[in-house]
C-alpha cells in the first residue's frame, strides 16, 4: 500500500498557492483570516 502523501511542488502550488486562493471569493476570505491572525506564511 502506497503512502497518501506523494509530494509535488506543482500540484501544491496549483491547489494551495496564492494565485489559487485569490481566484475565488472563499479563497480571499481564507487569506484575510490568515492575515488577521498574523500568519507569516499566508499560503503554500
From Swiss-Prot:
GO biological process, one term: translation
One function term, GO molecular function aspect: structural constituent of ribosome
InterPro entries the UniProt entry points to: Ribosomal_bL34 (IPR000271), Ribosomal_bL34_CS (IPR020939)
PROSITE patterns, per database record: RIBOSOMAL_L34
This protein's GO CC annotations: ribonucleoprotein complex; ribosome
Top-rank taxon: Bacteria
Keyword terms of this UniProt record: Ribonucleoprotein, Ribosomal protein
Family per record: Belongs to the bacterial ribosomal protein bL34 family.
PANTHER family registered for this protein in UniProt: LARGE RIBOSOMAL SUBUNIT PROTEIN BL34M (PTHR14503:SF4), MITOCHONDRIAL RIBOSOMAL PROTEIN 34 FAMILY MEMBER (PTHR14503)
Protein name: Large ribosomal subunit protein bL34
Biological source species: Anaplasma marginale (strain Florida)
